[in-house]
Amino acid sequence: MALSFFGGGGASHLKYFDIRLDEDYIVFRGGEQEAASAQLSGKLLLCLSEPLSAKHVRLNLTGISRVCWHLPSSSASGGRKSWREKVFYEKSWTFRDAGKSKTEILAAGNYEFPFHVILEGSMPESVEGLSDTYVTYRFKAEIGRKYAKDIVVRKPLRIIRTLDSSALELSHAMSVENIWPNKIEYSISTPTKAVIFGTSIRVDFKLIPLLKGLKIGQIVSQLIESHDLTLNPEDPDSVRNTYKNTRTIVNDEHELDEENNLEIIDEAAEGYQFSRFLDLPKTLTRCLQDTDTRGIKIRHKLKFRVQLLNPDGHISELRATLPVSIFISPNLAIDDNNNLVDQTPQSAQRAVNDLAQQAPPLYGEHQFDQLYSEVDPSGYRTPGPGSGPGTPFGTLSRNLSAENLASMNALTNTDISASALHSRLSNLHASRFSNPSPADTDGHTDVEHRRLGVSADYFGPSSGSNSHSPASPELSRRPSDEGYHDHDHIPSGMATPFHPQFAEVESLSRVPSYSTAVRSTVGPCDSELPDYQAVVAEDTAMPTLQSPQQAHIRSAGRGASTGHTGIDVHHLRSGLFNSRTSAHHDDDDRRLRLVQARARV
């Protein structure tokens, strides 16, 4: 290929001269403001059979943009042509330079001149396919000669700007649905807004006639490409000459077989539900990618027309439009003539599959989620049936449990498998309904712990009975409800309310008033918070409101059951009015305690 560019007598000594890139094209993922930089590297290869006299050996990379359009001619005047061409990027490498008016002799042999450059992510992508409008990059390698024609070889470079795997266009479905009163209920949708160039677009139709005797006529689906060209996009002060044009890329016509295609939709009404596939062209000359760079803006949309044959004989037409974005995938190579290298349906399907694995799955299609081996995921989905707002399963919620987190270190140091852990969790969930005796539960737990080599306090009562044990002075969580209604034998988290009601949640959210708080005693600053059993015991034998010990009502409201908390609060509020009739020395005593508490703080 390179030899066709050679000229002059010394060119016969040149056996090989070419530009070899490490990557066939450069890929930017994301828009111009978010894409990361990319490295372009390669080698300039030279093979000489005999010595060659040369002034220099150079390599240039040039980025050129051109915007041009032709206005149609009329009878009054001829056609008018508007155009603008600009070099927006240049990079040069000089491998050999003999100096001004000098030459050097390149000995016979093989030469490799490596080169590399960092391309910013904001660089324009290649736009090729239109006759006089483009954005291109070209390499030009040159061997300068003094008394002969220069030896030149050229190579194009394609820069692709594709979508990032987290782009919303890859996961958001596009749909238009509405009801034409007394005519038809319709829904037209596409699985995603973004479509890979060279593949196909799937369009899903759902048509439900609302008028008896209404028939569906011809259904036309079109892919429209719009061109918006601007001569001076960078200069806001100059006259912005613009030109707009559209062309039809795909035209699909379909007619329903009313007898065979009629079906029951959503178990409610009879209608038609089907899909159509619009195959995209395999060449950029017939279909461009969506872009907006260097005064060239390309956009695509789907237009639909559905004929409705009314019973009275007149014809109505339903029209709808959906936006669609076409992008070039790096997995489908494009040759120098702007055609797909592999145009088989299998290659297009592979590109779609690769894209599906890179993009995050849809909410209902999480087939790529990683699961633990041999773990049955049934029962682990939250919220469960009948669950309250934002409430997960009681036995599976770690936020509501009071397990000893320090004891989990023993679990991580053993070779326990995920299946064994799942078995223990399943047994724990089942024990909530069977309620075995404390002796049987302890015996079974000890045997299981010895078999697995795990400390006995894991899932044990000590996890919730004392959240401030020496084994875990800091790693603790808010205790659950065990211990108040005779649940001391139930492991941590087993007495968590399974379906908390709104009234219980409201009771748990109550906070003592300021007047209640000032009458409470204040402990020393260096004292620790009371443990769960101490709070429950204190809450069971509640003192009168004249005693400052009632300050623990907030802690009891969190740890005890919801019904108990409501009684406490009601009793506390009733006592507020009775305390106003108490003796005067009680008020003085409370004021003195308050002053002492503030002094300690």
Swiss-Prot record:
Keywords: Ubl conjugation pathway. Pfam families: Arrestin_C, Arrestin_N. One of its GO terms (cellular component) is cytosol. GO terms for biological process: regulation of protein ubiquitination; ubiquitin-dependent endocytosis. Residues 475-489 have a biased composition (Basic and acidic residues). SMART domains: Arrestin_C. Disulfide bonds: none annotated. InterPro entries: Arrestin-like_C, Arrestin-like_N, Arrestin_C-like, Arrestin_domain-protein, Ig_E-set. Signal peptide: none annotated. One of its GO terms (molecular function) is ubiquitin protein ligase binding. Residues 374-397, 455-489 are annotated as: Disordered. SUPFAM superfamilies: E set domains. Residues 461-473 have a biased composition (Low complexity). Component of the regulatory network controlling carbon source utilization through ubiquitination and deubiquitination involving creA, creB, creC, creD and acrB. May be involved in signaling by recognizing appropriately phosphorylated substrates via its arrestin domains and then recruit a HECT-type ubiquitin ligase such as hulA, leading to ubiquitination of the substrate, providing a link between ubiquitination and phosphorylation in protein regulation and stability. Interacts with hulA. Belongs to the arrestin family. This is Probable HECT-type ubiquitin ligase-interacting protein creD. The gene is creD.
